Amino acid sequence: MQFQTNPNCPPDAFPALFEDTFTASESTDEGRLIGHLAKQLTLDSRTDNHAIIDEHHGIRAAAFTSPLTNENGVNALLLAPVAVHPDNQGQGLARWLIESIVQSIKGNGCDILITYGDPALYGRFGFEGISPEVARPPYPLQFPEGWQAIIFTDKGRLSANYQCAKPFLNADLW
């Protein structure tokens, strides 16, 4: 298996992984919602696709990073969604994937990496809860404790109104 950014994969590979993973862990409706989001993100030229790929079984874990534009010139990225195929959960692929993404963007001028997910998972990689006053989410959050970030720069200049990529402009995702 290997980590790749923007791999050359069949167009349905990312959406299928996300739909299968979220259907298994949440519900059929959630699987469809996140699968559709993944499809839209694969079509967004500003979004990077990251994957752990097995040469025999295809994508086993994946995530997207997309820019969060703002008025302060802060180089911000949103890490979402993230999925590990149900057959590969518990094998360390989430750790490998997230750590690889963090390392790849850390040295490339990213000021802040934001995610919305389980604090128990993301806390293991250095994410900490972030106030909506520092980085306002696009919609009210169902789980405010899931709004987290890794800050790579001076915290003083990060406070901004961040605008996410168009595929995230859906209140059902938040």
Task: Describe every region a protein language model picked out.
Residues 70, 119-120, 146, 150:
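Acyl-donor-binding surface of acyltransferase catalytic domains
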Residues 91, 95, 141-153:
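Accessory recognition modules or surfaces
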Residues 51, 58-69, 75-83:
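Conserved beta-strand in the GNAT
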